[in-house]
């Protein structure tokens, strides 16, 4: 996945036409579109290929099962046209290996959740986040998911993985995270959802956040 705008759109809507219209409006400001269960369950896997006409698609299924089931899920996701899948790390190395094995067959990527962005993400996941990051590094994942709502945690994860893995960081906007803060902490991409797709003008909202990110990268913050 190419790093240009450093922003990923989390497209958590449930209407096909709305999803495609938003993607058409904001594609120039995002490096990828992340879709999850809400949109896929409402419209079917076919929406992945439709959205892929605008930007690479990350399937946020937080895959978390035994290895064989993980293989089946990832195979379906990549066959549908996704460029990457998000998997949980707490299921262990063999389950993660299964996801990475299928991804490699398709020449696609796997992101591993180290810690989620909501307040409850600190309850049980934070104590094991660093171990998950080390496991993802050893397993050869493409990147990690770390919370934009807690930039210090992003910085900690970055110290563990160095420059060997990428970090995508959800929680910017509606959850309280600030794009420039998390980029400064070491994230490669910020993930933004409601602040864009619920805006009166998704295109303008995306443009403003993209400008904030680029200003941080230029050292203007």
UniProtKB/Swiss-Prot annotation:
Biochemical pathway: Pyrimidine metabolism; UMP biosynthesis via de novo pathway; UMP from orotate: step 2/2
HAMAP family: OMPdecase_type1_A (MF_01200_A)
Function: Catalyzes the decarboxylation of orotidine 5'-monophosphate (OMP) to uridine 5'-monophosphate (UMP).
Protein's name according to its UniProt entry: Orotidine 5'-phosphate decarboxylase
Name of the encoding gene: pyrF
EC top class, as a word: lyase
Annotated catalytic residues: 62
Family (UniProt): Belongs to the OMP decarboxylase family. Type 1 subfamily.
Residues annotated to bind substrate: 12, 34, 60-69, 117, 170-180, 193-194
EC number: 4.1.1.23
GO molecular function: orotidine-5'-phosphate decarboxylase activity
InterPro entries: Aldolase_TIM (IPR013785), OMPdecase (IPR014732), OMPdecase_arc (IPR047595), OMPdecase_AS (IPR018089), OMPdeCOase_dom (IPR001754), RibuloseP-bd_barrel (IPR011060)
Keyword list, A-Z: Decarboxylase, Lyase, Pyrimidine biosynthesis
Subunit structure, interactors included: Homodimer.
Matches recorded under NCBIfam families: PRK13813.1, pyrF
SMART domains for this protein: OMPdecase
Any single Pfam family the record assigns to this protein: OMPdecase
Record GO biological process: 'de novo' pyrimidine nucleobase biosynthetic process; 'de novo' UMP biosynthetic process
Gene Ontology, cellular component aspect: cytosol
Catalytic activity: orotidine 5'-phosphate + H(+) = UMP + CO2
């Amino acid at each position: 996945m190419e790093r240009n705008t450093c922003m990923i759109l989390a497209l958590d809507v449930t209407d096909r036409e709305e999803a495609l219209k938003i993607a058409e409006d904001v594609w120039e400001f995002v490096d990828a579109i992340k879709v999850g269960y809400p949109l896929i369950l409402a419209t079917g896997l076919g929406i992945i290929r439709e959205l892929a006409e605008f930007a690479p698609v990350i399937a946020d299924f937080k895959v978390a099962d035994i290895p064989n089931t993980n293989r089946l899920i990832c195979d379906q996701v990549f066959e549908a046209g996704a460029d990457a899948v998000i998997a949980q790390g707490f299921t262990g190395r063999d389950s993660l290996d299964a996801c990475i094995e299928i991804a490699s067959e398709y020449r696609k990527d796997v992101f591993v959740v180290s810690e989620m962005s909501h307040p409850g993400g600190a309850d049980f996941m934070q104590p094991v986040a660093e171990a998950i990051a080390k496991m993802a590094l050893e397993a050869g994942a493409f990147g990690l998911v770390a919370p934009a709502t807690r930039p210090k945690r992003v910085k900690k994860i970055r110290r563990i993985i160095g420059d060997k893995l990428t970090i995508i960081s959800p929680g910017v906007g509606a959850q309280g995270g600030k794009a420039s803060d998390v980029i400064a902490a070491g994230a490669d991409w910020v993930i933004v959802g409601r602040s864009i797709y619920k805006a009166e003008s998704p295109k303008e909202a995306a443009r403003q956040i993209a400008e904030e990110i680029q200003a941080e990268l230029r050292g203007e913050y």
